[in-house]
Regions:
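Structured loop/turn residues at beta-strand edges in well-structured enzyme cores
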Residues: 26, 49, 62
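Thiol-based oxidoreductase modules, predominantly thioredoxin-like and allied folds used
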Residues: 6, 26-40
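Structural micro-motif
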Residues: 46-55
Length: 87
């Protein structure tokens, strides 16, 4: 699994969100994506319209869950734990 973090340098909630990611489990790949420099088009592909947006994707890039706006790492961690236990 990987966690896509859509952000922008001018976005204050994005800066706070980045600090929250220090608490994300190490087995989750964190992929920061600056929406203003997104050459791969992931912002459009995942229909991101506000920042920060975090999207948890599986091994085949399927969307597992998405969070929009500042989200506590504990909320994301709880979801990841519950999802992993079901697999």
């Amino acid at each position: 699994m990987k966690l896509l973090q859509f952000k922008a340098v001018w976005c204050n909630p994005c800066k706070m969100q980045t600090k929250e990611f220090e608490e994300i489990p190490v087995d989750i790949e964190l992929v920061p994506i600056d929406v203003d420099e997104d050459e791969e088009g992931l912002t459009t592909q995942y229909s991101v319209r506000s920042m920060p947006t975090m999207i948890l994707v599986g091994d085949k890039d399927e969307v597992i869950n998405r969070w929009t706006g500042f989200t506590k790492s504990s909320t994301i961690n709880e979801f990841i734990q519950e999802y992993s236990n079901k697999q």
